[in-house]
């Protein structure tokens, strides 16, 4: 996905300038973080992937994982006593993108894994996250309020927080299909 592929007209409240500024990669060179906050379906993941894609084109090493993949990686390697290897995988890239933070409550110890990554990357390497949950919910979702507080304290210190609000892109295609099916003229034009 790219910034050029993004439908800017669908949610005009999403400003292009800050996103194209991020696409320069300066935030990565300066070891700053980025957080996309907003309702589901508004394009947060698309924008994060587009910025990751641009970073790769600019020569940066990028790792993209959902929060569920991250937790699964650590739980799997913890069972195999290989946690340091997994941690190194998350510390090495210039940019780590963690998608869907807060989609649902995470398993026990997830806060420890996320804290370790954020703490070790803090002011050294960039991290980008997407979330559809307000920050005050993170303690409950992580299951560890002190860990969530420490994560947010470090992560937000040098982070650019972008509110991505508007209508759901996913529901747009559904409503377009329903409108087309309900409109007999549209159906007759399509049938010709």
Enumerate the language-model features and the residues they cover.
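Charged, amphipathic alpha-helical linker segments immediately N-terminal to NTP-binding catalytic cores
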Residues: 1-17
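Short hinge/gating elements
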Residues: 5, 34, 137-139
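Conserved P-loop
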Residues: 14-92, 141, 191
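Conserved active-site beta-strand-loop modules that form the wall/rim of enzyme catalytic pockets
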Residues: 45, 94-96, 126
């Amino acid at each position: 996905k790219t910034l050029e592929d993004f439908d800017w007209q669908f949610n005009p409240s999403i400003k292009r300038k800050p996103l194209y500024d991020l696409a320069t990669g300066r935030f990565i060179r300066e070891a700053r973080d980025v957080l996309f906050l907003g309702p589901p379906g508004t394009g947060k993941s698309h924008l994060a992937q587009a910025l990751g894609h641009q970073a790769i084109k600019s020569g940066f090493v990028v790792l993209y994982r959902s929060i569920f993949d991250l937790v699964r990686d650590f739980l799997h390697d913890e069972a195999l006593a290989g946690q340091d290897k997994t941690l190194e995988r998350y510390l090495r890239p210039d940019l780590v993108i963690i998608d869907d933070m807060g989609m649902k409550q995470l398993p026990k110890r997830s806060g420890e894994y996320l804290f370790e990554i954020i703490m070790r990357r803090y002011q050294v390497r960039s991290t980008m996250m997407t979330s559809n949950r307000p920050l005050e919910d993170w303690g409950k979702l992580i299951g560890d309020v002190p860990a969530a507080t420490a994560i947010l304290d470090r992560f937000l210190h040098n982070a650019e927080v972008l509110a991505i609000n508007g209508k759901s892109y996913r529901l747009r295609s559904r409503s377009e299909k329903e409108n087309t099916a309900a409109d007999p003229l549209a159906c007759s034009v399509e049938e010709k």
